[in-house]
């Protein structure tokens, strides 16, 4: 039987594409543009897994489709190659992280090329290349000049095992680090911060302008966390001190019965009484060991200590105790809250635990039993009594402003971005600190500030990065003799990935980040495909940098990525025992269609789970390509289900996709191809062109493949295949299975040219219309015959055809026809006697 020899055909076409630079980005200004972007990978030691190609295949199909439709297509690939794993590996093995990274990139590139992706490798970028990070550093100097990069003494998330501080976004809910799962403690350090908060409103508003999944937009909205309310100032009794709280419910001020400061609040030591000093100091120490996430966990037991001080509630003059508690964060809002326990669950639990007053100020509920958190008319609130929420907020804000004790205020949950890392393997921050106390940016003419090569990359132990040990690099002297010290912190991995999509547009420019005209031509990115796990971090940071560059006049668009698509996860085969615990695949045996634990004999349930080394269910694409071919892997991953769904890997599904490609190969190579069109496939062919064109455009790749299968089934029933339809079909399948597409194109045309730029097939709308229709003929209400007739025949024509039918004539022979009812396009009913 004829089959598709992938081991011969796939390498042949990969070599052809490379030799002929088939996928070099088009520059014909008269053509429309299409910029298809993948989230570039971190080149880990493990190489690609089968989850990577899912998104890559989707953008590749779109890119091939758009080339055939006459677009200039920019479809690049590169490497997000700085970051902790390479450094950790280097420290463990004594190898240079640059060498390790280069080896990993070579392996990734080999694997990617084996899958037949149509990348323009002339545009490859690598974030660790000094020619690339020169511009990462240049962007930093612009942020610094604009006052958007600054140093501050801030409590950071310190990870002792990693020897570095990490951003809030990199701390897991259990208070450990995202990388490595190490304990995170809070400690104050001098750090570089980026003022992303200055862009909070624009980052929020401009989400309306992009075509992104609503779930991702909501995650960004929640992270930015805009709230409108009021600042209220409380004086501390018997002192000249005061503190400000932000509240979204100033209308409940009459119900504020105590105040809480964050343990780190600057006022705590100044207002704590001698009696309470020891308890407060101990509580502050314990709070410093917890992460922000652990401190704000709603489920945890409420803890706190009274400072001994009282504040004055400005609206009624009542004295209220001032506490410290770790659920209030110094970094959020003002680091102080007014507590209204009658109407807030956390405040209510705290008040009950420490026996504090609970005064209801909204009608409804029983505040002795639980906090009443719904809306109601105001009570116990003097001039607000009887008002609803909106009216009461407006009136209270007016009163606060008139009395000079508060004002209307908009706040954001978003914090400034902690930008420095105490590690070696990252972009050096281009700042010099001089002995006279000033700091300056390294001038553009001296960029890139190259990361020095060193064997000693262990953390310095002082909280500084290993660069602090390299005195030759570290110490500088100005022309006027003033001595200086380079910044020893490096940038986080997020830096290089915040702008890489711009460098692809003009990757070899030595004079500027990218040429203005080229940026105008290619921006924004038309489709960006990657995992939903980057919803907040990378996507928010990239949007922030893009807006800064827009303000500088570097980029012409407000937003970088017009459309975002998150592919689902490919899950591995795994098994669960009766306790719900996952069992590694090497501990499972199959007997009579069921699965059992090899050691305990317990019957197991098959349950898809994330692929992991521990479960031994990771599928390596190299193995799949070797056994089934790259085209099979591509078609299978697109046919598994909707692209955004998470679906379990299946060997049977893979075999099904392989069989389909073999059938396609046989259809084109063994069926008689003719120049005469019998018309038998007119409808299904034109339906297939229409469906595949529309569904690829909408990224519904699974339904497009299903339609290709429909065509193959129909074509196999015919003795001959019309040449134009054979060619058109091969063009339709080529973006999904490009090696097979190229091979079959040569079988049909012997052109010697790639199929990549052959104009995409069009369909004939008139051939989609049914010209014939089946109608039923009933006699006395029972179906006696079915006729295939021309569409839209008149009643008379239908009647004549029905009465002329042999079966009908046999049924009515010797009977009187009372009447004939003909319904066009449906039926003929004959009443006889």
Curated annotation (Swiss-Prot):
Catalytic activity: tRNA(Leu) + L-leucine + ATP = L-leucyl-tRNA(Leu) + AMP + diphosphate
Cross-referenced Pfam families: Anticodon_1, tRNA-synt_1, tRNA-synt_1_2, tRNA-synt_1g
Subcellular location: Cytoplasm
Positions with a binding annotation for ATP: 613
Keywords: Aminoacyl-tRNA synthetase, ATP-binding, Cytoplasm, Ligase, Nucleotide-binding, Protein biosynthesis
Enzyme nomenclature, EC number: 6.1.1.4
Placement of sequence motif 'KMSKS' region: 610-614
Molecular-function GO term, any one: ATP binding
GO cellular component: cytosol
HAMAP family recorded: Leu_tRNA_synth_B (MF_00049_B)
Family, as annotated: Belongs to the class-I aminoacyl-tRNA synthetase family.
Name recorded for this polypeptide: Leucine--tRNA ligase
Gene this chain is encoded by: leuS
């Amino acid at each position: 039987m004829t089959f598709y020899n992938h081991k011969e055909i796939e390498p042949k076409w990969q070599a052809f594409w490379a030799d002929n630079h088939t996928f070099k980005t088009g520059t014909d200004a008269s053509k429309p543009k299409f910029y298809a972007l993948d989230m570039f990978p971190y080149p880990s030691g493990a190489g690609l897994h089968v989850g990577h190609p899912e998104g890559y295949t989707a953008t590749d199909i779109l890119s091939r489709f758009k080339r055939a439709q006459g677009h200039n297509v920019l479809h690049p690939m590169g490497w997000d190659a700085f970051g902790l794993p390479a450094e950790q590996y280097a420290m463990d093995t004594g190898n240079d992280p640059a060498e390790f990274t280069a080896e990993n990139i070579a392996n990734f590139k080999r694997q990617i090329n084996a899958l037949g992706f149509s990348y323009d490798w002339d545009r490859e970028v690598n974030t660790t290349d000094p020619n690339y990070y020169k511009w990462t550093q240049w962007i930093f100097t612009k942020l610094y000049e604009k006052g958007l990069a600054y140093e501050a003494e801030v409590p950071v998330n310190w990870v002792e095992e990693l020897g570095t501080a990490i951003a809030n976004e990199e701390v897991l809910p259990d208070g450990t680090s995202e990388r490595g799962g190490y304990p995170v403690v809070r400690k104050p350090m001098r750090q570089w911060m980026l003022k992303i908060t200055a862009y909070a409103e624009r980052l929020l508003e401009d989400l309306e302008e992009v075509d992104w999944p609503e779930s991702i937009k909501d995650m960004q909205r929640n992270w930015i966390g805009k709230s409108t309310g009021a600042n209220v100032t409380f004086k501390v009794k018997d002192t000249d001190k005061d503190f400000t709280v932000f509240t979204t419910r100033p209308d409940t001020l009459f119900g504020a019965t105590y105040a809480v400061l964050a343990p780190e609040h600057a006022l705590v030591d100044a207002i704590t009484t001698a009696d309470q000093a020891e308890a407060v100091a101990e509580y502050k120490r314990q709070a410093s060991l917890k992460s922000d996430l652990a401190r704000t966990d709603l489920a945890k037991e409420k803890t706190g200590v009274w400072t001994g001080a009282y504040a004055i509630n400005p609206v009624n003059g009542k004295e209220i105790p001032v506490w410290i508690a770790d659920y209030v964060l110094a970094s959020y809002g003002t680091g102080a809250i007014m507590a209204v326990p009658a109407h807030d669950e956390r405040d209510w639990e705290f008040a009950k635990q420490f026996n504090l007053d609970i005064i209801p100020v909204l009608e409804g509920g029983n505040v002795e039993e639980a906090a009443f958190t719904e809306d109601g008319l105001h009570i116990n609130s003097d001039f607000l009594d009887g008002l609803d929420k909106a009216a009461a907020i407006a009136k209270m804000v007016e009163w606060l402003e008139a009395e000079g004790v508060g004002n209307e205020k908009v706040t954001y949950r978003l914090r400034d971005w902690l930008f420095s890392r105490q590690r070696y393997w990252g972009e050096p921050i281009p700042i010099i600190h001089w002995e006279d106390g000033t700091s300056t940016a390294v001038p553009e003419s001296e960029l890139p500030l190259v990361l020095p090569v060193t064997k000693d990359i262990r953390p310095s132990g002082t909280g500084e990065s290993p660069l602090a040990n390299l005195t030759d690099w570290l110490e500088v002297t100005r022309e006027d003799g003033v001595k200086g010290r380079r910044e020893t912190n490096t940038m986080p991995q997020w830096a290089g990935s915040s702008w890489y999509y711009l460098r692809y547009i003009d990757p070899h420019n030595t004079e500027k980040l990218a040429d203005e005209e080229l940026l105008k031509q290619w921006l924004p990115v038309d489709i960006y495909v990657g995992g939903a796990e980057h919803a907040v971090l990378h996507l928010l940071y990239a949007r922030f940098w893009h807006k800064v560059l827009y303000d500088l006049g570097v980029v012409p668009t407000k937003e970088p990525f017009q459309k975002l698509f998150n592919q689902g996860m490919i899950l591995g085969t795994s098994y669960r025992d009766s306790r719900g615990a996952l069992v590694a695949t090497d501990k499972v045996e199959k007997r009579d269609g069921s699965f059992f634990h090899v050691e305990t004999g317990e019957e197991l349930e098959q349950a898809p789970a994330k692929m992991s080394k521990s479960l031994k269910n990771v599928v390596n694409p190299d193995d799949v390509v070797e056994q089934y071919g790259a085209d099979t892997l591509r078609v299978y991953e697109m046919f598994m289900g909707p692209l955004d769904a998470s679906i379990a890997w299946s060997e049977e599904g893979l075999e099904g996709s392989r069989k389909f490609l073999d059938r396609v190969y046989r259809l084109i190579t063994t069926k008689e191809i003719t120049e005469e069109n019998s018309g038998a496939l007119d409808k299904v062919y034109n339906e297939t062109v229409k469906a595949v064109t529309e569904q690829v455009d909408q990224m519904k790749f699974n339904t497009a493949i299903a339609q290709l299968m429909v065509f193959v089934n129909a074509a196999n029933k015919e003795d001959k295949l019309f040449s134009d339809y054979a060619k058109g079909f091969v063009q339709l399948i080529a973006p999904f299975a490009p090696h097979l597409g190229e091979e079959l194109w040569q079988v049909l045309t012997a052109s010697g040219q790639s199929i990549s730029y052959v104009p995409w097939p069009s369909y004939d709308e008139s051939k989609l219309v049914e010209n014939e229709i089946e109608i039923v003929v009933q006699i006395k209400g029972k179906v006696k015959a079915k006729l295939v007739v021309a569409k839209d025949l008149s009643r008379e024509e239908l009647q004549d055809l029905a009465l002329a039918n042999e079966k009908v004539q046999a049924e009515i022979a010797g009977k009187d026809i009372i009447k004939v009812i003909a319904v066009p396009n449906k039926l003929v009913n004959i009443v006889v006697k």
